Amino acid sequence: MLQPARTKYRKMQKGRMRGKAYRGSDLAQGEYGLQATECGRLTSRQIEAARVAITRYVKRGGKLWIRVFPDKPITKKPAETRMGTGKGNVEFYVAVVKPGRVLYELAGVDDASAKKAFHLAAHKLPVATKLVKRGETL
């Protein structure tokens, strides 16, 4: 699973998801990309499940880049615990995603394979996505 090796602070505030993603909204390496069209939080398990779905479909045919990293810790209190007495322990890490953010990039495959692979990956993710192609307006 993806998670930071070290962090400056163990716990983080909840924060808000507002606006669009301006950074990370263009294709950097690949020919095709999977772009988020709504905001949400991707856990490291969801990112990994989508990666496995893509790599299993394209097999050794293409090169895949993961463009998001889960660096935000999410805390949770144990069950049947009274309120108060501080913040809970870190349970998992998430990547905060805004609309327009490219999540995955793929190169070395044809249009149909990229479309099918990203379609399989989109089912594993909690945000709505669309396929983008290099050269087309994003």
Curated annotation (Swiss-Prot):
Coiled-coil region list: none
Cited PANTHER family: 50S/60S RIBOSOMAL PROTEIN L16, LARGE RIBOSOMAL SUBUNIT PROTEIN UL16M
Keyword Ubl conjugation annotated: no
This chain belongs to which protein, by name? Large ribosomal subunit protein uL16
Domain of life the protein comes from: Bacteria
The record's function comment reads:
Binds 23S rRNA and is also seen to make contacts with the A and possibly P site tRNAs.
| CDD domains hit by this protein | Ribosomal_L16_L10e
